[in-house]
């Protein structure tokens, strides 16, 4: 009987010890918050879930500002952006700052004064839509929840449109639009504010080539372009065909325009040509609209 009681007491003690250990593990697990993100992309004209993986540099706030994440890639897993290796938040009162760039395979570096930098970016046909995010002074979440991080484009979207202000019997068809002296390379850094340093390479952009018969309503000429933000005064060449409605068609009329352009980070510029029946543009050459 004593032996049986001894075994029972030993079992109870073992069970209590296991329960205590399990409770300790649960409490420790609850305290350990894995760094994860809820990532979205937002611009003045479009927003939605981020689609490309991104990489993050994460610093603890404080005197030392220890680097916790260093060019760590994050990808979506069941709607939450996680890294392949788990990284934990610090104590409950800890704060962090995150600096991110997308897509994750873009060559980038980080420094505390300039943030994330991408050098030698080339806005070629295959160039990605470069996005970035800066999130400072973020506290450790109270629950096992992802940290919201919002990306914006490092580029500027540009759209060209045209409308006719000619009389109804006049037909005007736009066939080509080009821009000269557009910088296509540059270096981008996110701190202290997002800024581009333009490279020496400049080129002529063919904005549109085709046939668009103008109406009194503005129509898009080609697709929206993503360009490196810059201030420039390009030569704009607008080519069109003119039908007077009296059996005479004049083809390939070229009109050159010089206008100051200002393309800013994360913005969209819309330019509208107003073409008249005077074989040229009206005095209101281009309407620039920023969104």
Predicted ranges, named:
Residues 8-17:
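Bacterial N-terminal signal peptides
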Residues 2-6, 20-291:
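Sec-type signal peptide cleavage vicinity
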């Amino acid at each position: 009987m004593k032996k049986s009681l001894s075994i029972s007491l030993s079992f109870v003690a073992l069970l209590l010890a296991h329960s205590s250990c399990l409770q300790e593990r649960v409490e420790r697990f609850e305290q350990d918050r894995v760094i994860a993100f809820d990532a979205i992309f937002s611009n003045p004209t479009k927003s939605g879930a981020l689609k490309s993986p991104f990489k993050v540099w994460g610093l603890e706030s404080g005197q030392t500002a220890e680097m916790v994440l260093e060019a760590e890639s994050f990808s979506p897993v069941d709607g939450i952006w996680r890294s392949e290796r788990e990284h934990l938040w610090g104590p409950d009162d800890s704060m962090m700052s995150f600096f991110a760039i997308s897509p994750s395979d873009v060559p980038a570096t980080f420094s505390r004064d300039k943030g994330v930098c991408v050098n030698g970016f080339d806005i070629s046909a295959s160039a990605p839509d470069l996005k970035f995010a800066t999130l400072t002074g973020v506290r450790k979440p109270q629950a096992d929840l992802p940290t919201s991080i919002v990306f914006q484009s490092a580029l500027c979207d540009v759209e060209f449109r045209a409308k006719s202000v000619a009389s109804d019997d006049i037909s005007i068809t736009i066939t080509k639009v080009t821009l000269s002296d557009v910088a296509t390379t540059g270096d981008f850094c996110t701190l202290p504010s997002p800024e581009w340093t333009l490279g020496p390479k400049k080129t002529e952009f063919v904005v549109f080539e085709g046939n668009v018969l103008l109406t009194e309503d503005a129509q898009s000429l080609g697709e929206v372009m993503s360009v490196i933000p810059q201030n420039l005064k390009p030569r704009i060449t607008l080519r069109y065909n003119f039908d007077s409605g009296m059996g005479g068609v004049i083809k390939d009329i070229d009109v050159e325009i010089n206008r100051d352009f200002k393309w800013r980070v994360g913005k969209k510029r819309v330019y509208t040509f107003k073409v008249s029946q005077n074989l040229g543009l009206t005095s209101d050459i281009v309407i620039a609209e920023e969104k």
